[in-house]
UniProtKB/Swiss-Prot annotation:
GO terms for cellular component: cytosol. The lineage of its organism: Bacteria, Pseudomonadati, Pseudomonadota, Alphaproteobacteria, Caulobacterales. This is UPF0246 protein PHZ_c0561. It comes from Phenylobacterium zucineum (strain HLK1). Residues 245-266 are annotated as: Disordered. Belongs to the UPF0246 family.
Amino acid sequence: MLIVLSPAKALDFAQPPVQAPLTAPQMTEDTSELAKVARKLTARDLSRLMSLSESLAKLNRERFQAFDPVSEEGLQAAFAFNGDVYQGLRARELDRKALAWAQDHVRILSGLYGVLRPLDAIQPYRLEMGVRLKTKRGSTLYDFWGEKVSLALNEAAQGHKDRTLVNCASGEYFGAVDRRALKLPVVSCRFLEEKDGQARIISFYAKRARGLLARYAIDNRIERAADLKGFDAAGYRFAPELSTDEEFTFARPQPPPPAASRNKED
């Protein structure tokens, strides 16, 4: 079983380092090619491509200017990303054995790196998968990555007892998975909040729940997708009446709204 997550827009490179292995991303040639394109973009270009404020556009232009795709330095991806998914995952709390299991069973989709393992070293960047960035391979990042993301996922699942790909990524990022090239069965997960007799998806809660589900799989060393039905963190329960073989649905009573001070950039 292999779980795929989206990255986060919010990054945290300021926390004290965690004593954990640092591995090299596996698609460095592609990342180098993309970085060359991104390095030519102005702050205005970045603002237009990703709807960034002037200050964020300048920051990310500086990041691309400093970006070194072959550097052996960086921070582990699971520790660097700081959005809602990663608040649920809480990777910094994992011990070495749990991190080793996650390294084999979790993948993070990335506009710049393609496919990341949790302990792969990344540098600060922002390049959303859905941007229309022209390269030699096409006019979007979906064109750029083509079959490569799917091929990397196929390889990552080799040797697993259950080769199911558990989709806990957003539609934007899972769109980079070419289903024709993917040789794995896919199960998607959705998370519903129930209130006043209605059930709906609320983005913030759904993102957090994806991280919680990945953490549940890591803590319990889940090897079969079907065993994820036991997920019960934060009040969620598997809802068989709302689920299919291709989509697992989890539901719970909707909690009170989160604090207004929460970091909105994910």
